[in-house]
Amino acid sequence: MEGNGKLKIGDNCFFNNYCSITARDSIKIGNNCIFGENVKIYDHNHCYNDKDLLICKQGFSAKEVVIEDDCWIGSNVVILKGVHIGRHSVVGAGVVIYKDLPANSVVVCKQSLVSIKER
């Protein structure tokens, strides 16, 4: 956590090796979630609107991340700020999640094609 960031992890969650969770605002993870190796979760991003100011001096924008109960997040997944992942969802290895997923979603990346469907 950084600054006033809040992290809540539910019961019976498993995190494999090298997972990273960085909260400047809030990250909430439900019960019975499984995370593969090297999963990254960020609730913030660097600001970069002022081209005359170094990016590292422009601060951050942040928005809560929520992962509901019984989700399986595969290895090397990146979850970005503001995302809400509905319960019983599966995210396949190597996917970058940048928008909300409804409950019972399955998300996989096949080369350059991203497929989202109901479970």
Protein language model regions, located:
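Flexible, glycine/small-residue-enriched loop-and-beta-strand segment within the central core
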Residues: 1-83, 110-119
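A generic "structured core" feature
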Residues: 72, 78-80, 86-96, 104
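Short helix N-cap motif at coil->helix boundaries in the Bergerat
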Residues: 99
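Acidic, glycine-centered active-site loop in nucleotide-sugar glycosyltransferases
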Residues: 102-103, 108-111
